[in-house]
Amino acid sequence: MTDSSISPSHPAGLSRALDNFLTRHRIGVWRVVVTFVLASLLFGHSRWDGTWVSPLLLTLGMLGVSLATVGRLWCALYISGRKNNTLVTSGPYSLCRHPLYVCNLLGILGLGAMTESLAVTAVLALAFALMYPAVIRTEDRFLASAFPEFAEYARRTPAFFPRLSLYRGESTWTVHVSSFQRNIADSVWFLGLSVVVESFDLFHDAGVLRAVVTLA
């Protein structure tokens, strides 16, 4: 049975339809999740504030956000201007097939840690776990249909968890500057959100905001 012959009522067809739905609407879902997180920070304060756990979470959070930002910029150098017309298999894409999403997870967990709330971090991690496997499957299907060499690339390269022994760089690489510049904004938004998260904490400490709930 070919892909085009799979009926929407077939289990594989239903799974593909769900994958496509989550892929199309992931930005909207993230907006809802981020709104929930910001509301939690507006009305809640961490139970760990003032304990040794607080600076630990903040440090881990800053590390995660920093790695995510640098990693996304590294990916953007390789993928900018090539996303739909070239199968990029070197640099970060030699380590795994979806390094951008690895960076997203690092940034999401980093932001969660910076809220100093394990509950908020768990919500962010759950949202990622529910959506991004579907996004990865959808993108893999597109790449398989667009590039005959993808099958060999997928055979040797893990989808998500990087394998450092596979790293292969380039001595020279042409960067699509205009496309890379557009991708810079997409790569640094974790930094912007981290500033917002810390601002809520500062406002609570200064008494500008009053917490009505304690965040675990």
UniProtKB/Swiss-Prot annotation:
| Topology class, membrane | Multi-pass membrane protein
> Which is one Gene Ontology cellular component term of this protein?
plasma membrane
Q: Name one Pfam family in it.
A: PEMT
UniProt-recorded Gene Ontology molecular function terms: transferase activity
A single GO BP term for this record reads: response to cadmium ion
Q: Report keywords, A-Z.
A: Cadmium resistance, Cell inner membrane, Cell membrane, Cobalt, Membrane, Plasmid, Transmembrane, Transmembrane helix, Transport, Zinc
Q: Does the keyword Glycoprotein apply?
A: no
Could you identify this protein by its name? Cobalt-zinc-cadmium resistance protein CzcN
Originating organism = Cupriavidus metallidurans (strain ATCC 43123 / DSM 2839 / NBRC 102507 / CH34)
